[in-house]
Amino acid sequence: LDDRFAKAYEYSDCWVQDSRLVVLNARDAQARGAKIMTRTKVTSARRDGDEWVITTEDTNTQDEQEFRAKMIVNAGGPWVMDVIQGVAGINSSENVRLVRGSHIVTKRLYDHDKCYFFQGEDGRIIFSIPYEQDYTLIGTTDADHASFDERPVCTDEERDYLLAFANNYFKQTLSSDDVIWTYSGVRPLYNDGASSATAATRDYVLRVNDEGGAPILNVFGGKITTYRRLAESALEKIGAYFPNLPEKWTAGVTLPGGDFDVAGVGDLRVRIKSKYPFLSEK
């Protein structure tokens, strides 16, 4: 950091590999009886009395299957409105605001393993995180994203914004030549009519539509940090239609591979190193 910054405060947080988290949740669900269908999309859903008739398509073979269900949970993320309107053919006054978050990756800018949060003149904050051993991850932005069909890409404007933001704090002056790669994602935030993408709520909103028969639960918003609480809230909504659901249980249950004492991570690392000596220290 620049020498003019002499004071800071420190707190602890968590990080997660998002794709691995999704896979582990799918494995856990499968072990508990769920059927996981990858590379499959829902092409239509229609009400038939107190049931849904759902048509799916295998994206590799184009084979179609038909299923019946008492209820649909629409956790489509950025595509939640496409499921509501395009797949289920339902009109909805609720909507999501698609907000793009872009990141830049540079070579490692400092030796320690701490993260930084920086505050800018516009009132926003960005982070700087040691990333994949050899790099530093800097982000993120808040930019309205036009459509879920449009691939999210870090724009030159977003890249320059993050560089200027970081240059207010680091000794080293970064330029576009220092950016090794960029990536972007889209947040499906509940559209609360906020004046800017930054001001849009990060809370999730759950809405059940049962007009005309079988219910559908639509999930607007949500994030990794609170995904299990969101799921519990969703089950409370579902419980109005299925009163014999079990009590909440996920708070004290690990995902596959996590069933060991946190205090024993060091010993686990030693055992793995001994069993698989070809693995890199990293």
Residue ranges and their predicted role:
Residues 60-71, 75:
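Core beta-strand elements of the Rossmann-like FAD/NAD(P) dinucleotide-binding domain
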Residues 56-62, 108, 120:
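Short acidic, glycine-rich loop/turn motifs
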Residues 1-33:
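Rossmann-like flavin
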Residues 35-37, 180:
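General small-molecule cofactor/ligand-binding pocket signal
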Residues 18-21, 28, 87-138, 143-282:
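C-terminal catalytic lobe of FAD-dependent flavoproteins
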Residues 10-11, 54-58:
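Short beta-strand segments that buttress and anchor functional surface loops
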Residues 38-53:
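A conserved short coil-to-beta-strand element within the FAD-binding core of flavoproteins
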